[in-house]
């Protein structure tokens, strides 16, 4: 099995971003959603990105943002990729002409294969836990058996992942990447560096990376 990629999401501090990179994370996620306790503003995001070494992917997470709001952020912050975590349509996601990930909140009866096909321009599909009225960051895992095999897009597994369960998640789902936020925190938006290291070690152990 090839090495599973990883993103540490909900970064709000420079020191947490650097800890994620030092532990081996491929990407960091910055949340531009004011209702989230992990949200950052433009100045915070710029400072975090400026502190990063080369070859670390920066992902901006948006939830049903207005076109004006999103364009203002894109003009001010050098993001590598967008993550749409709301009800954005394929056309809306495509309209920004940036590489993007589309998040789906998984519940029983969902046709994940059809959603992958609908968002054909996405670089990957992120699968998260469905909780009514909550767009993400619930800290709860979902039933991984709901994910069908042979999906047409790289799958990024999220939703309640921790250092203790990510190994089992990788073994069962065999995703392209894993995404964690609350599972490596000591408080909302404040990362626990030892948990980040433990999470990344579990990812390496499970994916066979050297």
Curated annotation (Swiss-Prot):
Pfam families xrefs: PRAI (PF00697)
Pathway: Amino-acid biosynthesis; L-tryptophan biosynthesis; L-tryptophan from chorismate: step 3/5
Reactions performed catalytically: N-(5-phospho-beta-D-ribosyl)anthranilate = 1-(2-carboxyphenylamino)-1-deoxy-D-ribulose 5-phosphate
GO MF annotations, alphabetized: phosphoribosylanthranilate isomerase activity
Keywords: Amino-acid biosynthesis, Aromatic amino acid biosynthesis, Isomerase, Tryptophan biosynthesis
Stored InterPro entries: Aldolase_TIM, PRAI_dom, RibuloseP-bd_barrel, TrpF_fam
EC number(s) given by UniProt: 5.3.1.24
Disulfide bonds: none
Gene3D superfamilies linked to this entry: Aldolase class I
Record flagged with keyword rRNA-binding: no
Keyword Amino-acid biosynthesis part of the UniProt annotation: yes
Superkingdom to which the source organism belongs: Bacteria
GO BP annotation list: L-tryptophan biosynthetic process
PANTHER family: N-(5'-PHOSPHORIBOSYL)ANTHRANILATE ISOMERASE (PTHR42894:SF1)
Family recorded in the similarity comment: Belongs to the TrpF family.
Name this polypeptide is given: N-(5'-phosphoribosyl)anthranilate isomerase
Gene: trpF
